Amino acid sequence: MHFLSPAKLNLFLQILGRREDDFHEIVTRYQAIAFGDQLSLSISSRDSLQVINACHLETPSNSIWKSVALFRRYTGITTPVSWRVVKQIPVGAGLAGGSSNAATALFALNQIFKTGLSDEEMRSLAEQLGVDTPFFFSTGAALGVARGEKIIALEESVSDRYVLYFSSEGVLTSRAFAAVQPSDCSSRKNLEYTQNDLEKPVFRLRLDLKEKKHWLESLWAELPVYIGLTGSGATLFVRYPEILEKDLSYAAQIQRAVTLSGGLLTSPIRRDPTAWYSIYSESALAAT
């Protein structure tokens, strides 16, 4: 069985302050995108994991094995399984690669063993696997509140396009939040839903990302776009309404900016509640 494990963007992320448990209270807008890893699952004689493009992730601490352990405890099914992952999402990129793998693995196990777990059950289990893991059991667009793990589904679809800019070095989420100062936080009375409050602390840690954003702002200056960091980084992204591509002048400028900047152009993706995210046909995935 083959599954897309999609990346996510934080279209905005606002920090409301530090909680009594020492974590930060946030509100964020999650969006799944048509870019991600490919997971394949089969029943086997022994447990195994192969990660193409990132063999250093073939460890017992991989988020996929955490999903397997949780699934086995919950269902009592202990049949060995074999995983093959074609890794595309960079580590420490703010794209939730590990969380997406964990969620996709949980969904895949439910499918292959026909255990009939509901989305609500899997979402509840996913809260034990990571802050943004539950999001992937939404339709692909949601608000995240509390630490980001409490999901409020959004039914409206967005007609945006995104251009992703990866970094050769990731950012640890824990390090980014540890660098947050009170002045970085948003006022509860003046939430703008257009910014990422983690940008300032991350840019203090990573001057190269701040400079990269300035470079992108100059490159895209003549177009009505938003440029920001997703999550705690290190990925920067450009967001613009898809309708711009229908204007020949704008379309040419967009193509030029994407080409000159070396960005990866992608789109939002939605999930049918009865299925999983997909931008690939089953035959195409089987051929990889």
Swiss-Prot record:
One protein family per Pfam: GHMP_kinases_N
Q: What keywords were assigned to this record? A: ATP-binding, Isoprene biosynthesis, Kinase, Nucleotide-binding, Transferase
Does the keyword field hold ATP-binding? yes
Residues the record marks as active site: K8, D132
Residues annotated as binding ATP are P90, V91, G92, A93, G94, L95, A96, G97, G98, S99, S100
User: What does the sequence similarity comment in the record state about its family?
Assistant: Belongs to the GHMP kinase family. IspE subfamily.
Q: What does this protein do?
A: Catalyzes the phosphorylation of the position 2 hydroxy group of 4-diphosphocytidyl-2C-methyl-D-erythritol.
- The name this protein carries in UniProt is 4-diphosphocytidyl-2-C-methyl-D-erythritol kinase
